Amino acid sequence: MALLEFFRPQKKATANIAKERLQIIVAERRNGGPAPSYLPQLKEDILKVISKYVEVNPDMVTVSLEQKEEDLSVLELNVTLPDEDDH
């Protein structure tokens, strides 16, 4: 039976794995200026991808851009996923 178990996917805490993967901070080197116009579309695209795997409230996803230094901005993505018991 070990051979069959090899091909069977392992069950893991998928909400926790997704939460870890989606708590992303991306440092982006760029010139100073106003927030990029792509942020709303980025949030919408992220919601579409997350919705394929778990039901999530759009208000629970935030995307922000913070100017840290003159030439360093931080793009922060926070997604609060529902507990596994909620679905």
From Swiss-Prot:
The question of whether Cell cycle is a record keyword is answered with yes
Segment forming the signal sequence: none
What GO terms in the biological process aspect are recorded for it?
A: cell division; regulation of division septum assembly
**InterPro entries reported in the protein's UniProt record:** MinE (IPR005527), MinE_sf (IPR036707)
Q: Which UniProt keywords apply?
A: Cell cycle, Cell division
Instruction: Provide an example Pfam family for this protein.
Output: MinE
Summarizing the function annotation, the protein's role is: Prevents the cell division inhibition by proteins MinC and MinD at internal division sites while permitting inhibition at polar sites. This ensures cell division at the proper site by restricting the formation of a division septum at the midpoint of the long axis of the cell.
Question: What HAMAP family does the record point to?
Answer: MinE
In which family does this protein belong, per the annotation?
Answer: Belongs to the MinE family.
Q: What is this protein called?
A: Cell division topological specificity factor
What species is this protein from? Aliivibrio fischeri (strain ATCC 700601 / ES114) (Vibrio fischeri)
Designated gene of the protein: minE
